[in-house]
UniProtKB/Swiss-Prot annotation:
GO terms for cellular component: cytoplasm. This is Phosphoribosyl-ATP pyrophosphatase. InterPro entries: HisE (IPR008179), PRib-ATP_PPHydrolase-like (IPR021130). Its main location: cytoplasm. Signal peptide: none annotated. The keyword Methyltransferase does not apply.
């Protein structure tokens, strides 16, 4: 397993988002406003789902990496810290999945 973490990627995305849009694809996405990176996230998520359904392991790995990257870009552009998402995941995993889902009041 690699030592590279989601927190590492988050630091890279945040650093690149602060760069000039002329110098950084990440900065260009963030500068475009929330719709552009959100659209890219959706596209990559669909591609990941298709790869999973098709049993394309290599494709799924690649698309999952794209999903994680674009999710972090959306978070950065929306002013949401990865730590907030991780805290929410930690809160949710403190109880069983079905109990946690029921506590949200959604099916």
């Amino acid at each position: 397993m690699t030592a590279f973490s989601l927190a590492d990627l988050d630091r890279i995305v945040r650093s690149r988002a602060a760069a000039s849009p002329d110098q950084s694809y990440t900065a260009k996405l963030v500068a475009a406003g929330p719709a552009k990176p959100a659209k890219k996230l959706g596209e990559e998520a669909v591609e990941a789902a298709i790869a999973a359904v098709q049993g394309d392991r290599a494709g799924l790995v690649s698309e999952a990496a794209d999903v994680l990257y674009h999710l972090l870009v959306v978070l950065v552009g929306s002013g949401v810290a990865l730590e907030d998402v991780m805290a929410e995941l930690e809160r949710r995993t403190a109880q069983g999945g079905l109990a946690e889902k029921a506590s949200r009041g959604r099916p």
